Amino acid sequence: MKHFEANFDGLVGPTHNYAGLSFGNVASFSNASAVSDPKSAAKQGLKKAKALADMGMVQGMLAPQERPDLHTLRRIGFSGTDAEILNKAAKEAPALLRACCSASSMWTANAATVSPSADTQDGKLHFTPANLVDKLHRSIEPVTTGNILAATFNNSRHFSHHQHLPEHSSFGDEGAANHTRLCENYGNAGVELFVYGQEATNPNAPKPQKYPARQTLEASQAIARLHGLSEENTVYLSQNPDVIDQGVFHNDVIAVGNQNVLFYHQQAFLDTQNKFDEIQQKFGDSKVHFIEVPTAKVSIEDAVKSYLFNTQIITLPSGEMAIIAPTNCQENPAVFAYLNELVTLGTPIKQVNYFDVKQSMQNGGGPACLRLRVAMNDMELAAVNQNTLMNDALFTRLNAWVDKHYRDRLSVDDLADPQLIIESRTALDELTQIMKLGSVYQFQK
């Protein structure tokens, strides 16, 4: 049986805009009110996904959320026709309207935490949608995320889907952006690393002072319990609160792992050496390559600006590892110099490939944000909804779908345009037919 890691990228939705909703995310905040280009954003994401499929990787797509989210606006007291609701919200509560129009579900690293069957007690692949309670615009995603995941991984013999954690800050959960898995081979039991920013039940534990810690230890422990993980293959690491206060809002902005490699910044974690000793002990006899990037070579500021660590490390069919990096890494002299050096250091990482995902980057999400990793075997892949898997036909069809339905210019003021609801719902209704998802959206029920 073959084992591999698949990547499921989020399709950028028709309302992709720059509303600056994410406090603690420097790129999101600094580009607030810029005019976005949803068509280009979607095409950039598709191009990256297709390039990985062309490299021989298993690549899938996850559908976006329904936006504008009129159901949430109704729930908080706006009434009337769809157009009237948009108009009232734009006048009376523009910040709430912006939150209900976000295309942030494109960053599927926050969609869920995934544990492969090799790690779980019942031998199934487990999915728990992230509750994303720290940010209003993302906290309205989990139910639809669960619907989309269940329609994509739609076989109960192989896949187990859990409800998101209770919607309270004690269980703040940001999904796979704070989780990585190390393993010798994808089919072997691995070591799952859960990175948290604070302990909700321990007021004396370290926590950031300026920006919120979005992931709690309690949430990470709950996910491990739900997924049936053993203590022997689970490690909890505290993120350095100082780097959270410098704009490192998720662990995938400061570290990334793949198989036997953990690529991280010198300042990423607390109690680093003890935790790495625990990882190595639980990993077993084979060596884990801990690749540390020193502050002297790349500052936290440069790491956040370029998204050096929000890259994907993938294992190519040849067995070599490659980094999938945003072009912003090429444009930052310190980061570009480091990546050129990295491939000469004798680590498993042998090449770097650069992709333009600037529409996503300007809203605070690099290549790693755009994908949910699912380690699986060929039997499990055969059980996935095949209409969600990237190939020449799907790439052509989705590009044509984007051309047909997406605007090439969207300002924050445009979010109050009633036509946007019609355009978005028409697009998503057609998408559910292309990807054979069934009725995953509220407007379809």
Swiss-Prot record:
Protein name: N-succinylarginine dihydrolase
Active site: E174, H250, C369 (nucleophile)
UniProt keyword terms in alphabetical order: Arginine metabolism, Hydrolase
Listed InterPro entries: AstB_sf (IPR037031), SuccinylArg_d-Hdrlase_AstB (IPR007079)
GN (gene name): astB
NCBIfam families on file: arg_catab_astB, PRK13281.1
Organism field: Shewanella woodyi (strain ATCC 51908 / MS32)
A Pfam family it matches: AstB
Record-stated family: Belongs to the succinylarginine dihydrolase family.
